[in-house]
């Protein structure tokens, strides 16, 4: 009864249990030899991560055009949703990784000028596996993406089926590189 009363008092005072939320780390970065630049990412570790030796599954989240490594956190509120669903027993704890995809479509370009998929598969996934307690089997990795990220989720997972056990593409932007080259979408975002 005392715990319930304390929670009600804290909730009414505007403190809604934020101390129990997952650990959000925004603005992390890794240098990519493939892309020849630093790539920012956010990572969300489940509550209790720092006090356990459990290996967690990883969900890689790809944003859409105009987004970045903070979009799923700011607009999707994914850390709170994750925490709530774990506490309600609807899902098991897991790690979320949100890399900055720029305008890459999470793919390598035909001419080799941008090697985003190479970065993701050969650099970021191994880096996360080596620096966090992750499940390294196929059922321990998933990808979800929205729009441009939906395209990336489909294309990356289909070419790397041995690494990812599931994929979700939300409103994927299924277009060819030629269409984007001809339309030059960067001009729209720069104006």
Please report, for each region that a protein language model flagged, where it lies by residue:
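Sec-dependent N-terminal signal peptides
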Residues: 4-14
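Non-catalytic cap/lid and distal C-terminal segments of serine-dependent acyl enzymes
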Residues: 19-191
